[in-house]
Amino acid sequence: MTPDLVARFWLVELHVRLPAWLRGITSASASVAVKRPGSSKKPLEPAPQPAPYKPTHYRHIIYAYDVMEEKCEIPVLEHDPFDFLDPQKTLVPPENTILIDPVAVGLPWFSTMKGTPQCIHWREAEAAGLELIEQVMAARGAGAVIPEKLKTSDQRRKMMELVETAVTICIYLYAVSDAARIRVLTKSIVFLFLHDDVMESKANAEGNSILEGWDTDTFKANELEGESRNDIFLDFCREAIALDPVLGLELMQDTVRWARYSRVNSTKADKTHATWQDFRDFRELDIAYDFMITAVRFGAAILYDPAERPVFEWIEKLYIRHCLYINDLYSYEKEFREHQQEGAPLHNSVHMIEQVLSVPPGSAKAILRSVLWDCERQVREEYVRLMQLPELTHTQKVYLQRLIESFAGNYMYSMSTYRYARLSGKLIGPPPEDCLLKNYVQ
């Protein structure tokens, strides 16, 4: 059995658990004395067992961010249709992944989903992110505006933080991606972060970001032309479309559309929301709805006819809501601090609950956690309903599973990323030598 195949059984100490039935067989067989006819009565010593195989693909988790002030009992499910996420019940994880048990790793896990895949191509993702950010910094004089944070003396750490965040998003939310697709997805997230940081700072009045200046309505795969300052983005477009002419083009267009949306809404930093529904509708667009759905499909290489999308409309809506609730829960402390110190806008679910119900942040977080659990309940109900449809194709069923894996992956990203955990998280292990943030972790 090859090492890669053995790795798929993820017999990894600490972060992977053996199923109960397999542990029972192992312990029982080890205790049985082995005898041969005519041999002495002294039992033979069992042969030494090889050490558990540690897949070299595993990306170490350094931080654990416990966002809740009070512990809670996770709702118990009699039957879970998401057994494929449970490391106790799934011996073979999806292709290009290993399956991680968050509790065994040491994360303060409170999701009703039992585990999450991690993409084994994280080194390729890191290389792609670093390559892109170095290109952007080298081309600063070409006309595109870059974030203020990348102009400071602490520039290198900011660059590493941006890349680390993009990589952590991609290896958990789009875990089944192969090496080529994870490279494209990582670059797309870096582009979004660069643009978003420009929009949130005074630099947005200085000119266009690297994502602006495109007309997606007339943009075609064979018309990759633009101003010189967009050469870096053009290279990204060519890479994405060469890899996947259909989904690559969709991903690129959704990236540019969101950049245009955020430019328009950057002038509405003080926007208020009269109701929770009004706030949620705003945030669903603000979080790049179409891009996030396309990214899941791109990573999994799943095409479906636009006419099929209404079938998935509700579960995709729940996916976006779940993502924005998780994002708001874990980014609240960071965003609140930036709001106080820099005057940054504060459009956050925790803050909205505080205002609507006149409760302190801890209570608002507990309420949002309950909202998350209810969202997961609705997701399970819709997943079961869809999987029982006789007309659902195999490809459509695979897409649903990829979507659910991304649900769980967003928890893992949010709990362990340096972007959020550096302020309030705790170290759960020393950073390895190849860690991007080794020189900055404290």
Swiss-Prot record:
Q: Where does Mg(2+) 2 bind?
A: 196
**Which amino acid positions bind Mg(2+) 3, per UniProt?**
327, 331, 335
| InterPro entries reported in the protein's UniProt record | Isoprenoid_synthase_dom_sf
Identify which cofactors the protein needs according to its UniProt entry: Mg(2+)
Q: Does the keyword Lyase apply?
A: yes
Q: Which reaction does it catalyse?
A: (2E,6E)-farnesyl diphosphate = dauca-4,7-diene + diphosphate
Q: Cofactor note from UniProt?
A: Binds 3 Mg(2+) ions per monomer.
Which UniProt keywords are given for this protein, alphabetically ordered? Lyase, Magnesium, Metal-binding
The top EC class is lyase
Do you know which Pfam families this protein is assigned to?
Terpene_syn_C_2
Binding-site positions, Mg(2+) 1: 196
GO MF annotations, alphabetized: lyase activity; metal ion binding
Instruction: List residues binding (2E,6E)-farnesyl diphosphate.
Output: 419-420
Please state which protein family the record places this protein in.
Answer: Belongs to the terpene synthase family.
Give the multimer and partner information. Answer: Homodimer.
Protein name per Swiss-Prot or TrEMBL: Terpene cyclase aneC
Q: What is the lineage of its organism?
A: Eukaryota, Fungi, Dikarya, Ascomycota, Pezizomycotina
Gene from which this protein is expressed = aneC
